[in-house]
Amino acid sequence: RLSLAEVRSLATAIAMTGGALLLSDDLPVLPAERLRIAEALIPVINEPVRIIDWFDAEMPARIRLDMVETESWHVLAGFNWADQPVDLQIDPVEYHLEAGHYFYREFWSGQIGECSEKDPIRFRAVPAHGCVLIALRRKVAEKAAYLGSDLHFSQGIELAEWLDEPAPSHQVE
């Protein structure tokens, strides 16, 4: 039986690579947290994926998916293939992204924040065979940003439209 961290890693790898999605579990008896994982994978994304460390490691640990829907953003995955918890660091430049400031949201935990090449995202004690799954959006001054949700692993295709319009001004006399 796979641990929750291992199920999340397997789901992340399949989702990020657009792999075949086969749900062979008995869905009516599946625990709610695992059913939620399956739900977050649909619809399947069929976009080109970049495996960043394809030739650098026995088990690639960094995957990048570029999304262009209602806006442009990146989905990054970082894996811990070790048999014990490890700290993971996600630096946008190491994922071959432009240096700059970004907002992020981690899918499995809901953690949100900001990062840059000088201030990468740090995750403490990622479980053995676990992963982090991040939506990364460039920070634009004076502009509202959608950070993501837990509806779909991409943290963005669930949006039909994102409007960044100033609030109407009201004059009080």
Please place each PLM-identified region on the residue numbering:
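Short beta-strand segments within Ig-like beta-sandwich modules, predominantly Fibronectin type-III
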Residues: G113-S116
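Active-site-proximal substrate-binding groove within the catalytic cores of carbohydrate-active enzymes
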Residues: R1-S109, R122-V140
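Non-catalytic C-terminal accessory domains or segments of carbohydrate-active enzymes
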Residues: I121-E173
